[in-house]
Design a protein with these regions (language model features):
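Bacterial N-terminal signal peptides
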Residues: 5-16
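N-terminal secretory signal peptides that target proteins for export/translocation
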Residues: 1-2
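Boundary at the C-terminal end of the N-terminal hydrophobic targeting segment
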Residues: 19-24
Length: 400
């Protein structure tokens, strides 16, 4: 592993093309913080998928739709195309309301994945299919595609991610999970940097935000949020005086990951900080990809540090790659069958024997891909959850 730092800070600070320069000077602010609201919902973990669909997914949609209607600056980010499919199937009236806010740019389709998958065990083909199937759904239902990888809770990150993400047209990635490390990753730090570029195995680069704070941060301190010292300190550590911060769902019964929404009072404080803040921090109610979009093309920003290497998690992650061995076996078997089925179908279509069965193959892919979720394939969910997982794995094998 190594970090390559390009010395261009002086040029960047005086360059008129830098987004931080123009926005900070125009606003009269010294720092800029992208506030990224999200509602982290584990599809399965200490509960099964039935509870997710019956309760947590419904609550998440209802609560955030209400906040979007009440607070004009609120922007909500939510990932996982499979969850949107379930909302459309089980709660079509909510899905139609979501469409409106997506069109307005205030409900952001983040993550660009069918499900927030573990990045280490799935094959590269599975990783790409996860993105492909999600983007096809988003384009069909919302007329847009997602732009980033949004994996706040996965258990370590392979260097192939920038390569695959860039190949799929994605421009950025964020996570808070590296803060869980017990040992430093680079020097005395758990992350290579707060904000910078990550280089993949083929040299492709995407922008990354690696110190966004916990995704369950929801109780903002009273007062002018634009004068908050914690936010200012976060921005001081990054190029151009910028920071990328998660905030989101409140805890349920002392535990997180149930979905939900940010606290209304915190959103009020953010709105006040945006419209009437007197402090040095310019607050942006942001989509998960806005930071990356603001800094493109990345070649114009040589001051951004570049990390080359893996970003593993050294705590519970190693055990995740050995637990629930049968689940991992079924997943790999489906990946092999999917590869064989795809090759056979393409040859048969090319030879004029039978048309390529896109719908049938996509259905089989989806049936097992969502179980590559970071608490499912990894073996960290409750026993009851795996009755659903194994069933889908077997059904997918039959379909392929």
């Amino acid at each position: 592993m190594k970090i390559m730092r390009f010395i261009g800070i002086v040029f960047a600070l005086f360059s008129a093309g830098s987004p931080s320069d123009t926005s900070a000077q125009d606003s009269g602010k010294k720092y800029k913080v992208y506030m990224v609201s999200n509602s982290h919902l584990d599809t399965q973990w200490r509960w099964d998928v039935k509870a997710t669909i019956d309760d947590y997914l419904y609550n998440t949609a209802v609560q955030n739709l209400a906040l979007l209607e009440k607070y004009p600056h609120y922007v909500f980010n939510f990932e996982g195309a499979v969850k949107y499919e379930w909302i459309k199937e089980y709660y079509p009236h909510l899905f139609e309301r979501i469409r409106k806010f997506v069109a307005d740019g205030r409900w952001n389709i983040s993550g660009a994945s069918f499900e927030a998958n573990d990045p280490n065990m799935p094959s590269s083909e599975s990783f790409i299919r996860n993105i492909l199937l999600a983007q096809e759904f988003y384009k069909k239902e919302f007329g847009i595609k997602s732009k980033d990888m949004f994996l706040p809770d996965c258990f370590g990150f392979s260097q192939v991610m920038p390569t695959l993400g860039h190949h799929c047209g994605l421009i950025g990635f964020s996570t808070q999970k590296l803060s869980w490390r017990t040992e430093p990753l680079v020097g005395d730090s758990k992350t290579p940097f707060p904000i910078g570029l990550w280089e993949g195995v083929d040299g492709a680069r995407i922008m990354v935000a690696l110190e966004p704070g916990r995704y369950s941060w929801n109780e903002f301190p009273e007062g002018d949020l634009s004068a908050n010292e914690e936010l200012a300190e976060s921005a001081r550590k990054s190029p151009f005086g910028i920071a990328y911060r998660y905030y989101g769902n409140k805890l349920a019964n002392g535990a997180g990951d149930h979905g939900g929404s940010a606290l209304p009072r915190s959103i009020q404080l953010l709105e006040e900080g945006i419209t009437n803040g007197k402090g040095p921090v310019q607050l942006v109610s942001a989509t998960s990809s806005q930071l990356y979009e603001d800094y493109m093309p990345y070649g114009n920003h040589p001051e951004l540090p570049v990390f080359v290497g893996e970003m593993p998690l050294d705590v519970h992650a190693p055990g995740c790659y050995t637990s629930q061995a049968e689940m991992k076996r079924y997943n790999r078997r489906n990946e092999q069958l999917a590869d064989a089925a795809e090759r056979s179908a393409v040859i048969a279509d090319w030879m004029g024997a039978v048309p390529y069965p896109k719908e049938a193959l996509n259905d089989a892919w989806k049936r097992f891909l969502w179980h590559q979720f970071h608490d499912d394939l990894t073996g960290t969910s409750i026993w009851e959850a795996y009755t659903y997982s194994w069933n889908d794995e077997f059904l997918a094998q039959g379909q392929f």
